[in-house]
């Protein structure tokens, strides 16, 4: 079995964006990468994130909301921050760990009816999915 590279998705609360990213990455990168996600804090898995990912056939309901694990952070090959807060507050990583920032809106901040909120979750879900698919195809 070949050694997989480690990708670590970070956002503020590990409830929406990084959870969706973990789900997409397991689909697109699972053969070559070990996929993890975490937050500066752990806010619990957002039920709307679970719902909209299920719509595209990806079950994230068993993923857990975790705070950043220094051990994973320090041995990751790639750390991806998904919000400005995580980019600003992410612990220092060793020089061998590549860090990139892919910014996405926070769907948990969406206002309006339940349907309007879900529309924002779907948009962010699709944006994250497209970004990870591009990374899977191009390596960047």
UniProtKB/Swiss-Prot annotation:
* Leading EC class: oxidoreductase
| Disulfide bridge positions per record | 11-83, 83-90
What is catalyzed by this enzyme? arsenate + [thioredoxin]-dithiol + H(+) = arsenite + [thioredoxin]-disulfide + H2O
**What subcellular compartments does it reside in?**
Cytoplasm
Which positions are catalytic residues?
A: 11, 83, 90
PANTHER family, per the entry: ARSENATE REDUCTASE
State the family it belongs to: Belongs to the low molecular weight phosphotyrosine protein phosphatase family. Thioredoxin-coupled ArsC subfamily.
For this entry, the protein name equals Arsenate reductase
Q: Name its species.
A: Geobacillus thermodenitrificans (strain NG80-2)
